[in-house]
Amino acid sequence: MKKHAIIPIFIPHRGCPNDCVFCNQRKITARTTAPTADEVKNTIDTWLTTLGEVPTVEIAFYGGSFTGLELEEQSSYLAIAKEYKDRGLIDKIHLSTRPDYIDKDILDNLKAYSVDTIELGVQSFDDEVLRKSNRGHTSAAVYEAVSLIKEYGFEFGIQLMIGLPGDSLETCIYSAKETVKLKPSLTRLYPTIVIDDTELLEMYERGEYQPLSREEAITRTAAMYKILDDAGITIMRVGLKSTDIIGEGGSINGGTYHPAFRQLVEGRIARDEIEPQLDRIVDEIRERRDKSCELIANHLQGRDLVNESFNQQRLSRVKVDVFSSPKWFSNAVGNGGENKKYFEEKYPELSIKFRVDDSLEAAQFRINCNT
């Protein structure tokens, strides 16, 4: 049974005066109408009729800088959500905004309307990356916003982007580690894509920006994922959905988009965990076979007999079982079976079977060698 459902309400970026290089919302907003109160209610009612029995239901206001809207407009939307919460029809109210659009007046208003979670579009903790991305604030704004949010007792989340101008593996890891220090309830990881009507597209066309390859994006995101996951932080999303692209109002002109990007990342994490265990097994097998062939060579007469015995040893494949939790079984095999293919090519000595072990946790793997 589904444990958590989100009812998304998209609010255009009319509250955000900034021009981040990756965002085209200021241009889209000119031709996008904000939802009316009736439209918001209809959206919520429609979702509620389809959800069934779900322990936790959230109304989430997406679209960027919700707290950048005029306070009166924020309140009009929040009043609708609070009504559903007061009636017991939903459990939480969630919104996303910029770190520099948090102050005590805003938080007082959010508290009055029973908001639970504030998600901050941090994108990076590296000031040079923020500057090159024209974010309009430094990392100091993040620390200040989080301090205030904690003071008021809200849950908070952090969104990070991978592959912004000036970004690197080192700055990505730094951002993940700084996130851990702040102890958010949730995170989202988004590889940068280049969409229409953005400064980033112009930079790309001028040769001033190079999007990450898929391999680079997977490597960096996997490194960040492991840091956050090891700290026990919930990773709500990895990569954009196709509906996110539509919501952003543009087609992709560069960067990493894959409908199953999370599985690509989790599959890489699985491979990185399984591979050293298989390496050790293969090293032991090769060592045993070398010793076996040496013993055979000492007892057999003639080069042909020795070579024949050696080749038989080489052709004998060792059966190995790779166990994972049910939830991570597909990640062990890899998206499209890519991990399975990778291991088969790297370890011709092994006959590998992927199996489920209910006792294992997510991202835990056990190897059984049937020698």
Model-derived features with residue positions:
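N-terminal pre-triad scaffold of radical SAM enzymes
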Residues: 1-29, 41, 45-63, 67, ...
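Short acidic/His/Gly/Ser-rich catalytic and metal-binding motifs that mark active-site loops
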Residues: 16-20, 195-202, 246-248
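Short acidic/polar active-site loop segments enriched in Thr and Asp
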Residues: 57, 91, 116, 185, ...
